[in-house]
Amino acid sequence: MHIQFPSKPTLPRACWEGRITAGSPGMPPDEIEIEPVRQSSDKMLYCEAESPPTVEKVKPARENSETDLEIEDDEKFFTTGQKELYLEACKLMGVVPVSYFIRNMEESYVNLNHHGLGPRGTKAIAIALVSNMAVTKLELEDNCIMEEGVLSLVEMLQENYYLQEMNISNNHLGLEGARIISDFFERNSSSIWSLELSGNDFKEDSAALLCQALSTNYQIKKLDLSHNQFSDVGGEHLGQMLAINVGLTSLDLSWNNFHTRGAVALCNGLRGNVTLTKLDLSMNGFGNEVALALGEVLRLNRCLVYLDIGGNDIGNEGASKISKGLESNESLRVLKLFLNPINMDGAILLILAIKRNPKSRMEELDISNVLVSEQFMKTLDGVYAVHPQLDVVFKAVQGLSPKKTIFLLTNPMKLIQSYADQHKITIVDFFKSLNPTGTMKMSVDEFQKVMIEQNKVPLNQYQVREVIKKLDEKTGMVNFSFLNTMKP
């Protein structure tokens, strides 16, 4: 049987001119379209490489069924075509091909961070990706791609509906880059749902453009705008966008310059947002004045699960305002307050607010720069009794003797393993013996109770909590089934 391979890879019309091309995405494979020859343009993603000669490959006769070998041959040809296309694009752009990209262009994840591509190297990559159906996540951080490179990427995205995640952080995009990105996402549908734009010199005008696009485009789910220069006006634009956007689920705004006005405006938009579950506002330094607005967000918002407000100059006064929101919040699970000037008094306000809320779902409170006392630990025991799923991370306990400190910090799994070894049983057998039903699962509440009451391996509250963290399925249950392979 003779198999005649096509003379060139079948590509979307953005790459080959004046040829019969594959239909647009969504067009049946047997439909084709004919385009007239266009004039060459350095601003378009065209690769005018001559088509390679027709290759005829003879294969031995086989049974009337496809085999893995036939499929592999087809895939090999597809890969060869992609490689040739990229090499021709590099020749056209006058750049040296990236060997890593050639080796990995048929993988789902391609990491080209810190490769020094520049605008023309980025364009060569974009040309190769126009027809690529394998790459779903592309990393291009720190390549100095600038606005010319961004233009090549968005032209590629008009044809490529397979790429889903893209990182173009730290590329000096500035206002013009923000304009190109915003225009594309405002006017075009795309498969991109995760976009990282950290450290691109975006200022207030850039915020206005990006927020205008995000006010109508709900395809983006995860957005990183950290390490930019948004301030009060940028905060107002972001707040207005968040009030109407129903797509974003994760937003990183850390390391910007939000002051009181901008941060409060941002919080106002968050109050009624119904999709955002993760928000990072750390390292903005907006102070206690914004804490009241944050407390209102926690009181009214029913969607936010993760909130990082570390490094924002929030003291005990701000902690008091935030605690008001924690008293009624039913969705938040993680609250990070690390690197804020909160002392033990502020920390007590926070944990008591959680205790007073029977519907709290809090799992982690990060106050890891706060020194606490033994009295705080006793108060915390009462909170843990109500909310056993909670983990409060603090710096250390003041005034403990070295012996007591060692007792508190001894790895509980090693103690249990030692007991199991002495009695010639497995660690799973130890836990099953504590379960009245003898099964591999218990509720967190019941497990905590029996671990405190058992006298085989004496453990304190904090060691029991460490055991729970290792076994917790995050469903309110602990599971012993994987302990045979767990290291102490």
Curated annotation (Swiss-Prot):
Annotated keywords: Leucine-rich repeat, Repeat
Cited SMART domains: LRR_RI
Protein's UniProt keywords contain Repeat: yes
Name listed for the protein in its UniProt record: Leucine-rich repeat-containing protein 74A
Gene from which the chain derives: LRRC74A
Species this chain originates from: Homo sapiens
Swiss-Prot/TrEMBL LRR repeat ranges: 134-155, 162-182, 191-212, 219-239, 247-268, 275-296, 303-324, 331-351
